[in-house]
Amino acid sequence: MITISEEAQAHFVKLLSKQESGTNIRVFVVNPGTSSAECGVSYCPPDAVEETDTRLTFNGFDAVVDEESAPYLDEAEIDYVTDQMGSQLTLKAPNAKARKVSDDAPLIERINYMIESEINPQLANHGGQVVLTELTDDGYAVLQFGGGCNGCSMVDVTLKDGIEKQMLEQFAGELNGVRDATEHQAGEHSYY
């Protein structure tokens, strides 16, 4: 479910040594499965553990996860990185915004999951997003861009060299291409 690097484990042990005995960490997701999902880590005193919580045992502490957050923390990674700017904990949870779908789920569900978990987080860097409006009978994903992507002069590159390339690779043999249904209007909202 959650991978915690050795560096992060050592950091948690150091932090927890200054807390009440029996205190562990809690890893959670606020607003799981939505575009506003946020992950967090907090102290978890012994009396804050619920019967339905999952305990993951690490070196010197447990990570406690509530029942609602658990599926959204699948494949989550916590690391403690040090660079010239200092040290910090990083938490990557690729399934926080959308629950992972099974490999045999309908194609439309797998495309929507890919959009929410991989594509939209990248587009969000430019204030944009994309939604799947249709999956045609002849195997084309019809997308609509919004936010900073609407009217952006780089949208064709994003569509063909980015999104379509990723989707055709991931859904080889199932998807024939990607089309843009957006009526692009350049304006101050456009990224480029």
Curated annotation (Swiss-Prot):
Stored Pfam families: Fe-S_biosyn, NifU
Cofactor: [4Fe-4S] cluster
Cofactor note: Binds 1 [4Fe-4S] cluster per subunit. The cluster is presumably bound at the interface of two monomers.
Keyword annotations of the record: 4Fe-4S, Iron, Iron-sulfur, Metal-binding
Gene3D superfamilies reported in the protein's UniProt record: Fe-S cluster assembly (FSCA), HesB-like domain
GO molecular function, one term: 4 iron, 4 sulfur cluster binding
Top-rank taxon: Bacteria
GO BP: iron-sulfur cluster assembly; protein maturation
Binding positions for [4Fe-4S] cluster per the UniProt entry: C149, C152
Assembly, per entry: Homodimer.
PANTHER family: FE_S BIOGENESIS PROTEIN NFUA, IRON-SULFUR CLUSTER SCAFFOLD PROTEIN NFU-RELATED
Function: Involved in iron-sulfur cluster biogenesis. Binds a 4Fe-4S cluster, can transfer this cluster to apoproteins, and thereby intervenes in the maturation of Fe/S proteins. Could also act as a scaffold/chaperone for damaged Fe/S proteins.
Family: Belongs to the NfuA family.
Protein name: Fe/S biogenesis protein NfuA
Organism for this UniProt entry: Alteromonas mediterranea (strain DSM 17117 / CIP 110805 / LMG 28347 / Deep ecotype)
